[in-house]
């Protein structure tokens, strides 16, 4: 049976998380769905997988709440269930930046659709002639799997380091059109809002992130694959599982070449961690 994998988020003010959390958990468990839903005062972030009918039924139920009526999840298919359990968690933020919380009622950051971004990249500038800077907001190990051509990345280990990195490089963004991007849109939206707040003049988020770009225009101007946070590890521009795997001892990304090493034992070790504390604890 084919499994439908969806991811979606929305920055929207939520003041009834104590009611939403058990209701969502009950609905998902009854439908046989697995994955994670994060709820915070600033919104919702979810990754779910299950049969088509179960996914569609849950989304119909979710859309009945006016706050979530416009959520359009990104989809991919797999032969296996990528998640082991169903979790619904209450958090301070749906994506941790450790900065003042996003205020959903004040609106989202400007966005650029994948087809429009491809046109900008094809022509070498935006529609007003400004150079376009692709700014990767993801962690360093994700960037290593693949990113846009000539993208700027700040070698951060976690998203909460992004504000400090932007502050150090803000002058380099002056006079340019900055397009922040990430896997599915949530980090680049929050990053774009933060950059606006600190005075970066012309900033957009890539609508739907890399996965939506793959879905709508393919891999043009992109090199490599896109890291995803489930057993598939990486998807290619056709949204198919790619070669890299993740070591579940140290969380490093293991390339197809590294998987040939005798040090690579699924779930136990890889060339990055063999003999380390991470490997010993696995």
From Swiss-Prot:
UniProt GO BP: tRNA modification
Gene Ontology molecular function terms on file: oxidoreductase activity, acting on paired donors, with incorporation or reduction of molecular oxygen
Domain of life (superkingdom): Bacteria
Keyword Glycosyltransferase annotated: no
Catalytic activity, as annotated: uridine(34) in tRNA + AH2 + O2 = 5-hydroxyuridine(34) in tRNA + A + H2O
Catalytic residues as annotated in Swiss-Prot or TrEMBL: 182 (cysteine persulfide intermediate)
Key words of the record: Oxidoreductase, tRNA processing
EC number(s) given by UniProt: 1.14.-.-
All copies of domain Rhodanese, residue ranges: 128-222
Role noted for this protein: Catalyzes oxygen-dependent 5-hydroxyuridine (ho5U) modification at position 34 in tRNAs.
HAMAP family linked to this entry: TrhO
Family from the record: Belongs to the TrhO family.
Protein name: tRNA uridine(34) hydroxylase
Provenance organism: Cupriavidus necator (strain ATCC 17699 / DSM 428 / KCTC 22496 / NCIMB 10442 / H16 / Stanier 337)
């Amino acid at each position: 049976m084919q499994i439908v994998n969806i991811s979606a988020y929305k920055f929207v003010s939520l003041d009834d998380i104590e009611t939403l959390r058990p209701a969502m958990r009950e609905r998902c468990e009854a439908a046989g769905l697995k994955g994670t839903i994060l709820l915070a005062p600033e919104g919702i972030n979810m990754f779910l997988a299950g049969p088509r009918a179960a996914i569609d039924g849950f989304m119909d139920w979710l859309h009945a709440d006016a706050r979530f009526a416009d959520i359009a999840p990104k989809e991919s298919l797999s032969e296996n269930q990528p998640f082991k359990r169903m979790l619904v968690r209450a958090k301070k933020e749906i994506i941790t930046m450790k900065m003042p919380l996003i205020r959903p009622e004040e609106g989202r950051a400007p966005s650029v659709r994948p087809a429009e971004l491809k046109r900008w990249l094809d022509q070498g500038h935006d529609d007003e002639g400004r150079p376009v800077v692709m700014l990767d907001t993801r962690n360093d190990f994700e960037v290593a799997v693949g990113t846009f051509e000539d993208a700027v990345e700040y070698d951060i280990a976690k998203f909460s380091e992004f504000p400090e990195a932007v502050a150090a490089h803000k002058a380099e963004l002056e006079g340019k059109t900055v397009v922040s991007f990430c896997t599915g849109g949530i980090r680049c939206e929050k990053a774009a809002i933060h950059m606006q707040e600190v005075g970066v003049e012309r900033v957009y988020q890539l609508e739907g992130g890399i996965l939506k770009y793959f879905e709508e225009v393919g891999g043009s101007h992109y090199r490599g694959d896109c890291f995803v946070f489930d057993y598939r590890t990486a998807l290619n521009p056709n949204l198919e599982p790619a070669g890299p795997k993740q070591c579940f001892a140290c969380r490093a990304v293991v390339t197809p070449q590294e998987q040939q090493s005798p040090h690579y034992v699924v779930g136990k070790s890889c060339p990055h961690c063999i003999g380390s504390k991470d490997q010993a604890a696995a």
